[in-house]
Each structure stands twice: as C-alpha cells, then as structure tokens.
C-alpha cells in the first residue's frame, strides 16, 4: 500500500520546486513530445531523473534537487528550465508555461500511456479526460509530522491569495472562460482537490490517507490533490495552488512566500501552548475566497479571516510582505497579471504573439 510515514518528516526549511510545462512546436502550438523527451532521449543534468510525464503527451513536469533554503531556489529553477529548453530544442520542440495553454483543445490530444494515468482515466472519466492543466508545486521541509499537519491547516487561508496572484489561465479549449484562472476550476472537477478540511493530528491525516487507499478512493497518496497538504513521502508541506508560469521571477516570488509562510507557522507551532486548538477557518469561507481568486485574479477581494467585511488582494499583499519580510509577491501584484497579459496580447496582436509570449 502506497502511503507515507511520519518518519519522513525529519528536516526543516528544505525546499523543492516542481513545475509543469507544455511541450509545443516551433510555432508555439501544443504537440505530443513527452514520450520523446522522457523515455526515448537522455535528459541531461540537472533534469536527469527529474523529468516526467503528465497526463497528456504535451505536458511534462520538472523537479529541482532538494535545496537547503530559499536562497538556492532562483538559480536551481533557472538551471532546470535552461536544461529543459535546450533538451527540447535538440528534439525540435519548445517549452511553454501557463496554467492552461490557450491553443490546447483536449479532444485533439493524446493521453499518456503510463499505467497510473490510464487507471485514473478509467476511474475518473470526463473530468480527467479534459484535464489539460499545468501547475506549480512548492515543497517545504518540516521536521515533525504533527507540525506539518498544523501548518497545513493554517496555510489553507493563504492558498486563494497565491492563486489570485498566479492567475494565468483565462483560456481553455479555445475560448475565453471569463475567469482569471480557469485551471483552478478545471482541476477542481477531479476528486480529492480544492481546500481540505482541517485535520486534528498527523494520526488523523494518516488514517484518512490509509482509508482512502484501502477502500479504493485513491490508488496512492499522490492522488490527494489538495491545494495544500502534508506530503507523507517527502516530509514536506506541499503548496499546489498556483498556476504554472513562463516567467521564473514570478515563480521565485511564490517560492519565497510559501517558504516564509511554512517557516513562520512552524515557529508558531513550536511556541504554541495548545498546538491543535480550533483554527476557525471554515471550509465554506475558504471556498468562497478561492472562487474570488479564480474569477478575479489580481482584482480579487477576500472575506476577511478574523474581522467583518472583505479585504482586497493589494492590502493582503502589503500586510504579508511587512509581516514576513518578503518582497516578491508585491512585485507580482504591482505588475499586470498573467491573465490580463494574455488577453491584451491576444486582442492586440493575435494568437502567434500570445503563443510566443508563453514560450520559455
């Protein structure tokens, strides 16, 4: 049975970054290429052993090595991307980044042959058949399993903030959805996604994970696709809310923010006299804020966590930067959002320019 172990949670502050990308042709149009890149070729360092298939044959995922902290992340992210772009170029292919590719029509593309994905397609059917999404996943090491669950519970409020800042997928299946992040809505069609309820302890989380596997809800722990989760294999808190990005500086900002959040909450846990007191974060409120994020992107406002009324994204960003000593998310917020950029480019210059804009 593929479930994790509390012993995996042994290191604090380590970092790993997983990015999903689209394989495109010379014109920036999605094309099958993952088999060629993953199985038929020999990926170079630093992506040897860290390049994998995703559900569709035009989507791949990269992983950085385990990093000792956030300071190492920008260089590692760029080294992985440069290696992937060069490797794809050798095969006559290019790489693009976004939550959804505006030129991808899911009925026109093949799914991967990997048995795990074939099993998911059989079990989940339509929601997985149309799942052309690409995301950014950030792992931060936590040295205690109960602490990882406590941190994950509190991280839930911040996932709509990350989603709003990252919103980079207005187009799906050839049309404008009217959303800033259609990826988030498409992905929520799968089971075991979105913002989870709070868990009382690691034992409660592990019992849930084991029960889901034993009774056929999932085949392995990796199919708990929540926006944030304790990863019982890597010993991390994994943040899965953001859309994928073409610009590595935007990825840097989200990595900095996620790492700072996990680090700060981990310290709070160590200082807290009653670590598993009630969090006060209702799932319904979190879902409402996620909807605002996926619909409005940078223009989102959120139901306030501890007071009456709403708070706009800009105010949240200012408070978080001041509280945590980070700056990247302010730069992201001050810039035009990914969704807005895509719409402006398509309206002004057309598809060809948009596809080039999304290419690495």
Curated annotation (Swiss-Prot):
Its EC number is 6.3.2.2. It comes from the Archaea. GO terms for molecular function: ATP binding; glutamate-cysteine ligase activity; ligase activity, forming carbon-nitrogen bonds. It is an enzyme of class 6 (ligase). It comes from Halobacterium salinarum (strain ATCC 700922 / JCM 11081 / NRC-1) (Halobacterium halobium). The keyword Ligase applies. Signal peptide: none annotated. Catalyzes the synthesis of gamma-glutamylcysteine (gamma-GC), the main low-molecular-weight thiol compound instead of glutathione in halophilic archaea. The gene is gshA. This is Glutamate--cysteine ligase. NCBIfam families: gshA_cyan_rel, PRK13518.1. InterPro entries: GCL_type2/YbdK_subfam, GCS2, Gln_synth/guanido_kin_cat_dom, YbdK. Keywords: ATP-binding, Ligase, Nucleotide-binding. HAMAP family: Glu_cys_ligase_2 (MF_01609). Pfam families: GCS2. One of its GO terms (biological process) is modified amino acid biosynthetic process. It catalyses: L-cysteine + L-glutamate + ATP = gamma-L-glutamyl-L-cysteine + ADP + phosphate + H(+). Belongs to the glutamate--cysteine ligase type 2 family. YbdK subfamily.
